[in-house]
Amino acid sequence: MKKLLCICMIMMSCISAFGQASVSNVAIPEPEFNGDAFICNLSANTYVKAEKAIGQMKTKDQFWGPERKLYVKPSKSSVRVKKGHIQFIIRVPNINDDPYSFIKISKFSAGSTRKLSLARQNELSGKVTYGGKNKQELFFEAKKYGASSLLIDADIEKPGEYCIMISNPNRVDGKIPVSCFGIDE
């Protein structure tokens, strides 16, 4: 009986050691909270957390119709990366939802604050355009990463201030959390 117990203990310690080794093989962990984003380099196993900011949404009545804009202070992000191919790991509420329906990568219009045109409605035609007249939204590709995150690939060539926004239809106030970063030459 003691031999059987000893063999079981050895097997359990081996399984435990193997389980810990497989967890440590994960190069880049998933972000902790929904909406958090890591800017990562998977080939070098490095990452940096994107700046988390709370944007204030305001609606302005323009000549051509109402326009919703998102304002974020300060005017520049503290997180800077080089232009080119960029990968993000973003934690999402439901990994099985279509990422193109609720994730937006957008370029800010930078001045004293960072601002982003969310939607504009034309009074005459009733047409609603998203991303503003200068097409601030960027194309990306998405894949599942881990248990509750997505790996986002985007090619960003223009220097400036950018954000990743996860839309939440249940939000009732005018504050929107965004993950911000800046692109340098």
Predicted region positions:
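Exposed aromatic-hydrophobic patches
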Residues: S149-D155
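Primarily secretory-pathway and cell-envelope proteins
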Residues: Q20-G126, N168-E185
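A glycine-anchored, Pro-Gly-centered beta-turn/N-cap motif
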Residues: D155-M165
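Extended, solvent-exposed segments with strong compositional bias
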Residues: A119-A147
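Sec-dependent N-terminal signal peptides
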Residues: L4-S13
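Positively charged n-region of N-terminal signal peptides that target proteins for export
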Residues: M1-L4, G19-Q20
